[in-house]
């Protein structure tokens, strides 16, 4: 009986170790890295203009999609201008809540319009794992765009 149990136990420990190592090696972006992505996106936006910047933000596996981090953007009313999920582009997300009912888009837009930048936390479907997870997003308003990037929290 011990021999039958040892293989599944070793498999579980190996799986946990691989997952832990992946986090330790930086496969999961951090809030600091999310903020850095926003700052990098703003530099690109200011240097190349909004049309080219939005095109680059929307490019699959482009400069602004790294690990599990990605830049997304909306206008001051909540209409999405850039997002890895192309179905969201052009859609007004202002009233759309997170999976727990929190109006996080509204919070991002309102704070960006009143303060210019900040952080908002919410629960979101992780596009890599397919599971609900806590996320914190940094955003900054530049002209008529709100540039955002969020990191999933452990």
Identify the meaning behind each predicted range:
Residues 2, 7-9, 13-154:
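N-terminal membrane-sensor/transducer module of prokaryotic signaling receptors
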